[in-house]
């Protein structure tokens, strides 16, 4: 998360995974905030040739609304899901709270939260359950420039203010536990960009930072599948697909 020279808040995000298909979804709920989000279609098993065309495939596309990996809403709230530093599964079990998974939490926040504080208040009203049997943490940022990491350890929720988040824990309960050296490399690159520019970056510089911090394919691992720069004032997203930063795909919430 950084600011531009005119104090616009921007957020950059790399999604590193196996080779996959992704879909950008504009959601316009009747009783919630409009948003643009990104779904990994491989989680649904739609197949490599899937396109949201025709009645059946368009109906399938609705599933992507509820499993976003990242997104921005019309209030300038950005939420992104990242793997944390280990495989601890969160399963909170308070009898008085409804249940939520990591990805449906992102949809809830995009629909209902205008800023970081509203997002945190919403998360505290639910039992969290990890998707795909591993540890997750969420990066949440708002148009005012607030940004936090939300993590779960021993079924407790922890909140840490931060401008940069990668694939290792920040909370005191598990601080420094990491998924590997690649996460440390990414953090070093992004912190260097942030510190050398005193936290002031253009959208183009944010894209350059994401390009430098990208992951390359290795065997069955596909590396960086998409990169996105979010503008939290215009509520827009500029995507780059599979490390091709020469071609951008702009989307707006409205």
Give residue spans per PLM region.
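C-terminal, well-structured catalytic/ligand-binding subdomain of enzymes
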Residues: 2-58, 63-65, 70-71, 80-111, ...
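Acidic, contiguous internal or C-terminal segments within carbohydrate-active enzymes
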Residues: 104-116, 120-126
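Extracytoplasmic, non-cytosolic globular domains
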Residues: 123, 128, 138-141
């Amino acid at each position: 998360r950084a600011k531009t020279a005119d104090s616009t808040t921007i957020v950059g995000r790399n999604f590193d995974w196996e080779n996959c298909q992704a879909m950008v979804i504009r959601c316009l709920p009747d009783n919630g905030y409009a948003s643009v989000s990104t779904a990994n279609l491989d989680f649904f098993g739609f197949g490599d040739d899937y396109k949201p065309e025709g009645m059946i495939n368009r109906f399938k596309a609705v599933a992507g609304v509820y499993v976003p990996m990242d997104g921005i809403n019309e209030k300038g709230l950005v939420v992104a899901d990242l793997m944390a530093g280990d495989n601890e599964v969160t399963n909170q079990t308070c009898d008085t709270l409804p249940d939520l998974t990591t990805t449906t939490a992102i949809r809830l926040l995009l629909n209902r939260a205008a800023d970081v504080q509203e997002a945190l208040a919403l998360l505290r009203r639910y039992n969290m359950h990890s998707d795909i049997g591993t540890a997750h943490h969420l990066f949440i940022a708002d148009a005012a420039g607030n940004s936090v990491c939300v993590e779960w350890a021993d079924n407790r929720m922890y909140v840490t203010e931060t401008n940069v988040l990668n694939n290792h824990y920040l909370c005191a309960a598990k601080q420094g536990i990491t998924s590997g050296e690649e996460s440390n490399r990414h953090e070093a690159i992004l912190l260097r960009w942030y510190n050398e520019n005193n936290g002031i970056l253009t959208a183009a510089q944010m894209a350059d930072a994401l390009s430098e911090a990208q992951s390359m394919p290795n065997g069955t691992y596909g590396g960086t599948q998409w990169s996105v720069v979010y503008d939290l004032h215009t509520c827009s997203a500029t995507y780059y697909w599979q490390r091709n930063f020469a071609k951008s795909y702009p989307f707006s919430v409205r």
